From Swiss-Prot:
Residues 1-284 are annotated as: Interaction with HAP1. Residues 1-40, 67-181, 963-1047 are annotated as: Disordered. It comes from Mus musculus. This is Jouberin. Self-associates. Part of the tectonic-like complex (also named B9 complex). Interacts with MKS1. Interacts with NPHP1; probably as heterodimers and/or AHI1(2):NPHP1(2) heterotetramers. Interacts (via SH3 domain) with the dynamin GTPase DNM2. Interacts with HAP1; probably as AHI1(2):HAP1(2) heterotetramers. Interacts with RAB8A. Interacts with CEND1. Interacts with SPATA7. WD repeats lie at residues 457-499, 502-541, 545-585, 592-631, 648-687, 691-730, 735-776. Residues 96-106 have a biased composition (Low complexity). The lineage of its organism: Eukaryota, Metazoa, Chordata, Craniata, Vertebrata. SUPFAM superfamilies: SH3-domain (SSF50044), WD40 repeat-like (SSF50978).
Length: 1047
């Protein structure tokens, strides 16, 4: 290679020298532009800061000017605050821009000249950056926490500053667990709000055997003075209802103690709302004369009397309390926002051990201001919010807030057997209003005869319903398109109260607790749910999960903490419901039944439980419970006996209910038969009439036990007398198209509710009305001696009284029957006079039969009788001899001159019968027997000519009218009638009815006219369902004799 000549080298150096000045010039221009941009940004920022300071000064001036006019500034200032905060955010985003050229100096590090220039410019840049950073920190102090960015330098700085409040801000807030939008105190314009402090819980406290029942004491202190905050109105009670007038400051309030031993938990959960009846905006004002409020929370515990006597350190304690920890909360934060409407987590601190040095300030304030804060290893959860005071607060035995009146004592209420409206009528808004029920305590229940109103049960009807024990609420398990709600209606107004939503399928059963504060429901969605009966409570209180359908659920009568459920898996489960615990506890499972459990019931005391399954087996349990130890008592439940009757073996049991006397059990089975079983001898009485082969139907007994109601698959409600087994009434014209599923009788009123599960089926309520009963009695008097007809409605309602059954309001005929059985001597004395009267009546028979008519209603206020499947027909002479009231007999009408009544029907004995008991009557073939009443289909009560009386078989006799053509043969004991002879007397009967149906003038001298010869009597025979009435006349007898055979 050729060596380079000096000329070449010089030329190369000149080229380099020529290029170097151009590069230096470009770098210098870049530096100048960067510095100019920094200067412009700093100038703009300083200008913005000056503008903000000017605005702040203007705000202070405006506040002072408008201080006398209003407590709060106008909305324009709030708008200015929002604009200013937005501008701060924008400027903060632009501030980090100048740091970019500083972070990349690699462009200028190639030459020594550039390095020197950089060194000269560094102090100048650093001064600008320090000023910007310092101003950034000032701005960050005024920006809310949720809006300020967190650069790395700022984080390091905060960590370095905090020593004892490492995770807390200056307001005492450790963490905001439920963040709401920040609340500015200027936005709180509602003066009706008062301060409410909700104490939730703490984390686990430090293990200490001396802590057994902690509580929280809340102080409201002024930061300026260190004393309790002065009241806005000195005459207004803030902490206590009986607050003295000379107390002009806000007194502290304590929560209820949390007993670790009783509640079996070391994690205190008070969940208590403490209300300070002070104007809430007053505590949040930013004026100089207004207090700057700090809330202090002390966790305390009781000192026992032994500790107070023996412990010398008690002198340092206050009022016999052991101080465990304390916390504080500033209502107004350093960022200008209020620490309210959010669940806050406050750091707890140990109380100082040194004694108080300042007696003129609150002790907790001295801890906060003078003493070092030593962290306690736990936190406290609180929520502060403004509350609107309700217009009406129910009084209580003990006043729990400043607005609650203290009234009465438990001892007074027990002595007078009175309870507060808070206890007797939960869940009602107008519980102070007393309802006067028409049915008096101990009075017999009546059959409701008047339609009260209809209630909406949803698109698919109602499956079950039940009145509360106080009678003020009707709970109905309904079905709609969207779900299966429990609808609560107020009684007696029928007003809708609220819906309880939660079930996902059909609700089979529901039951009220003894105090009506809880309601339990069972459903085919595999759950049983417990609901609180409170005004604003619509959600589920407890859920009891099951593996399959739940058919029944009941509260134990002795305690509302126990719920018993019956499930499709043949298990009976006992659950404990505790208000302090989050979930229900399954105490025990009873696996005895071999098929799914359909129904469960208890007696009134709760000593016995009865469970029925799908194969007809009833198990009786001993279920005594000690209220103080519920779980242990449940483990001792045992089987008393099993009832396996052959009559309903294999037949599903739909419903069980204990009779009010506690000695009998109502059994509703799916064989269309109801039974009431005597639990002592296991003998049952049957009630037939209601069809039930497929559906689950609930029947019910009235609270007095004198009536039995049951629905049917034919849409009719049947009513029986449990004592006699007789059907006393039926509701035949109800508007139900589906099966009547459930019936509930009101516990304090003569009221009943019906429901059906079907498309748009309503809930019907009927009530007993005395005026309606009187109208029915007047209507039935026109039938003059006949019993109520099966198609007669009471005041266009659906209640029908069966022809063989009495009206539900009168018991006079029953008394007459009992009197007649017990006074046979009086009857024998009357017989002789009765025979003479009968002879007089027979002599006038022809005249009476010609003048019979029913064109005018009979006068007189006689009431409709009550009889037992029988006729009680006699004369006025018998009435006077027996000393009984006129209303005890059926439609006896008086004329102006002569009294005519239907005598007892006469029958003829067809066969001989010898009495086997003392109360029976011996008869011979051909004897004429006078029938007084018919006990049942097989046995009648009557007397023969000789004066002997007693019961005789009904199938041994025939009507005397069959022998009217040959009376001498009857006396000679003629042979039994042949079927041909039986049909002969019936032929003239039809023609005779036709002739008697024509209207004839009424003879005013005559008294009553027999119904058998009137148009109404004819209509009665047409409407009578399966009851045969033989009506014949005799030439020698003035009155028609009737015999009704009840099938």
């Amino acid at each position: 290679m050729e060596p380079e000549t000096p000329e070449k080298v010089d030329s190369a150096q000149e080229k380099v020298r020529g290029k170097t000045p151009t590069a230096d010039d470009s770098d210098d221009s870049r530096e100048k532009t960067g510095i100019e941009e920094k200067g412009e940004l700093t100038d703009a920022y300083q200008l913005q800061v000056a503008e903000e300071m000017a605005k702040e000064i203007k705000k202070k001036i405006r506040k002072k000017l408008k201080e006398q006019l209003t407590y709060f500034p106008p909305d324009t200032l709030l708008h200015d605050d929002k604009l200013a905060s937005e501008k701060r955010k924008k400027k903060k985003k632009k501030v980090p821009v100048p740091t970019k050229p500083e972070s990349s100096p690699s462009d200028v590090c190639d030459s020594a000249v550039e390095g020197e220039q950089k060194k000269e410019g560094t102090p100048e840049d650093s001064q600008h950056m320090e000023g910007i950073c310092s101003r950034e920190q000032d701005v960050d102090a005024t920006v809310p926490e949720n809006a300020k960015p967190k650069p790395k330098k700022t984080k390091k700085k905060t960590k370095a500053v905090s020593n004892d409040n490492e995770d807390t801000n200056g307001d005492g807030v450790h963490e905001i667990t439920s963040r709401d939008s920040p609340v500015h105190p200027k936005c709180l314009l509602d003066d009706d709000l008062v301060m409410g402090v909700y104490i939730h819980r703490t984390d686990r406290l430090k293990s200490d055997f001396m802590i057994s029942h902690p509580m929280v004491k809340i102080h409201v202190v002024d930061e300026h003075t260190g004393q309790y905050v002065k009241k806005d109105d000195s005459e207004r009670p803030v902490s206590s209802y009986y607050e003295k007038d000379n107390v002009d400051y806000i007194l502290p309030i304590m929560t209820q103690p949390y007993d670790f031993k009783k509640l079996k938990s070391r994690l205190p959960e008070w969940e208590e709302q403490v209300i300070f009846n002070e104007n809430f905006p007053y505590l949040l004002r930013e004026f100089e004369e207004c207090p700057k409020v700090i809330l202090f929370f002390e966790i305390l515990d009781f000192l026992s009397m032994d500790e107070i006597k023996n412990n010398s350190e008690v002198q340092n304690q206050e009022c016999g309390f052991r101080k465990i920890a304390w916390a504080f909360l500033k209502l107004l934060g350093a960022n200008g926002n209020a620490n309210i409407n959010s669940k806050l987590r406050l750091q707890l601190y140990y109380p100082p051990t040194k004694p108080r040095s300042q007696l003129n300030v609150v002790e907790v304030f001295e801890w906060w201001s003078k003493c070092p804060r030593n962290r306690y290893p736990s936190t406290l959860y609180v929520t502060v919010r403004g509350l609107k005071v309700p217009d009406c607060i129910k009084p209580s035995y003990r006043s729990m807030m400043a607005l609650q009146e203290e009234r009465g004592t438990p001892v007074y209420c027990e002595r007078h057997r009175e309870t507060s409206s808070v206890d007797t009528e939960p869940g009602l808004e107008d519980s102070k209003e007393e309802v006067k029920w028409k049915r008096l305590p101990g009075q017999a229940c009546r059959i409701p005869n008047k339609h009260l109103f209809s209630l909406n049960a949803g698109e698919r009807g109602c499956f079950c319903l039940d009145f509360s024990h106080n009678g003020r609420i009707l709970a109905a398990a309904c079905a709609s398109r969207d779900g299966y709600p429990i609808i609560l209606y107020e009684i007696p107004s029928g007003r809708f109260m609220r819906e309880l939503c939660g079930h996902l399928n059909i609700i089979y059963d529901l039951d009220w607790s003894k105090d009506d504060r809880y309601l339990v429901t069972s459903s085919s969605d595999g759950t049983a749910r417990v609901w609180k009966n409170e005004i604003n409570s619509t959600s589920t209180f407890r859920v009891l999960p099951h593996p399959s359908f739940v058919y029944t659920a009941k509260f134990h009568p002795a305690t509302r903490e126990l719920v018993v459920t019956g499930c499709y898996d043949s298990m009976i489960r006992i659950w404990k419901i505790d208000a302090r615990e989050d979930a229900a506890i399954l105490v025990r499972q009873l696996d005895v039944h071999k098929s799914f459990v359909n129904s469960i019931c208890f007696d009134d005391e709760g000593h016995h439980m009865y469970s029925g399954d799908c194969i007809g087996v009833i198990v009786v349990w001993d279920t005594y419970v000690k209220v103080n130890d519920v779980q242990t008592s449940v483990r001792h439940w045992t089987i008393n006996k099993e009832i396996k009757e052959t009559e309903f073996r294999g037949v599903p049991i739909s419903y069980l209910e204990v009779h009010p006397n506690g000695k009998r059990l109502l059994i509703h089975t799916k064989d269309s038969t109801l039974r009431i079983m005597d639990l002592r001898i296991l003998a049952a009485r049957k009630f037939v009439g209601a069809a039930n082969y497929r559906e689950k139907i609930h029947s019910t007994l009235t609270p007095c036990g004198t009536l039995l109601f049951s629905g049917s698959e034919d849409g009719i409600v049947y009513v029986w007398n449990p004592e006699t087994g007789e059907q006393v009434a039926m509701y035949s014209d109800l508007p139900f198209k589906s099966t009547i599923r459930d019936i509930s009788y009101h516990p304090l009123e003569n009221m009943v509710a019906f429901c059906a599960f079907g498309q748009s089926e309503p809930i019907l309520l009927y009530i007993y009305d005395f005026q309606v009963a009187q109208q029915e009695a007047e209507m039935l008097k026109r039938y003059s001696g006949t019993l109520p007809l099966p198609g007669i409605h009471q005041s266009e309602d659906a209640l029908c009284t069966c022809p063989k059954l009495p009206q539900q309001g009168s018991f006079q005929i029953d008394e007459f029957v009992n009197t007649e059985n017990s006074s046979s001597r009086k009857i024998q004395l009357v017989k002789q006079r009765l025979e003479t009267v009968t002879e007089v009546i027979r002599s006038c028979a022809a005249k009476v039969n010609k003048n019979l008519s029913m064109t005018s209603p009979p006068p007189g206020p006689a009431k409709k009788p009550r009889v037992k499947q029988s006729f009680v027909l006699t004369t006025d002479e018998i009435i006077h001899q027996f000393g009984l009231p006129q209303t005890a007999f059926i439609s006896i009408e008086r004329g102006p001159f002569v009294r005519h009544v239907d005598p007892p029907p006469m029958v003829v004995a067809l066969y001989d019968y010898t009495a086997s008991r003392s109360d029976e009557l011996t008869i011979h073939r051909g004897d004429i027997i006078r029938v007084y009443f018919k006990d049942n289909e097989d046995w009648w009560y009557g007397s023969v000519r000789k004066g002997q009386e007693g019961f005789f078989p009904a199938n041994h006799v025939a009507s005397e009218t069959l022998y009217r053509d040959s009376p001498p043969k009857v006396k000679e004991r003629s042979p039994p009638l042949t079927p041909k002879e039986k049909t002969k007397p019936e032929k003239p009967l039809a023609s005779q009815k036709q002739s008697l149906s024509k209207g004839r003038p009424l003879d005013p001298r005559l008294g009553p006219q027999p119904v058998g010869h009137s148009e109404k009597g004819k209509d009665q025979n047409v409407e009578d369902r399966g009851h045969k009435v033989d009506m014949e006349t005799k030439k020698s007898e003035p009155v028609v004799r009737k015999v009704t055979l009840i099938e």
